[in-house]
A protein has these predicted regions:
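Bacterial N-terminal signal peptides that target proteins for export
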Residues: 2-12
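Bacterial N-terminal signal peptides
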Residues: 12-23
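Carbohydrate-interacting regions of secretory-pathway proteins
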Residues: 24-214
Length: 214
């Protein structure tokens, strides 16, 4: 079974290379690298009004503080909709709100994992049954330090959304009979996969996508 699964990973990596181009997709031991560390090939700067400047330097994506939301989104939609993990590492340098919002597919819809929103401490999923991360049962509270790298991971299966901050599981949401959607507004531009910050100075690195066993 392990050999079959590894073969599926190789096929998946090859598929992404074929559709997105070798500039942004590099097979790696921890999944498929969506960011090549050199430029934003395969990505686009999301057209948020008043978004902060974005550049690549020293193998990281540097996002300056914007008026409100800033970020990037994958420039292609040929990605898995379920049975995958998405992960990224992020560091907040300044600001008091979320610094690595991850927008991702959930079947035929999308959701966002928000670490450190609503003043810097709320962690959760937006939106569930029309309620934001601060309002629904995924809401937890966590202090995020500046100048410290955090590892964020999202796992999507047909039955669940699970999220981790470093090694701590912070979301374990059953999807049956739940209405999953993006919060209405600018975040709807952050598809099919997006990374966003809200009035923060942010560094992003090691963006990976990996299929998992059904």
């Amino acid at each position: 079974m392990k050999r079959i699964f590894e073969s599926r990973e190789a096929v998946f990596a090859g598929f992404l290379v074929a559709t997105l181009g070798v500039g942004c997709v590099t097979p790696g031991g921890g999944g498929t690298e969506l960011f090549n560390g050199k430029n934003l090939d395969g990505w686009e700067v999301t057209d948020f009004a008043g978004g902060g400047a974005i550049k690549v330097k020293d193998g990281e994506i540097h996002i300056a503080m914007g008026e409100l939301i800033s970020g990037i989104n994958l420039a292609h939609e040929n990605i898995p909709r379920t049975n995958y993990e998405l992960e990224a590492e992020a560091m907040k340098l300044d600001g008091n709100d979320f610094f690595c919002g991850l927008t991702f597919p959930v079947g035929d819809t999308f959701a966002s994992f928000i670490p450190g929103g609503w003043g810097g401490t709320v962690v959760g999923i937006s939106s569930i049954d029309g309620m934001d991360a601060a309002e629904n049962e995924t809401a937890t509270f966590k202090q995020f330090k500046t100048h410290q790298w955090y590892h964020f991971r999202v796992r999507v299966t047909p039955g669940k959304i699970q999220c981790w901050v470093d090694d701590e599981m912070v979301v374990d949401l059953l999807l049956e009979d739940r209405a999953i959607a993006l919060r209405a507004g600018p975040i709807e531009l952050s598809v099919p996969i997006g990374i966003t910050s809200f009035q923060t100075v942010t560094r992003i690195r090691n963006i990976r996508l990996q299929p998992i066993k059904p």
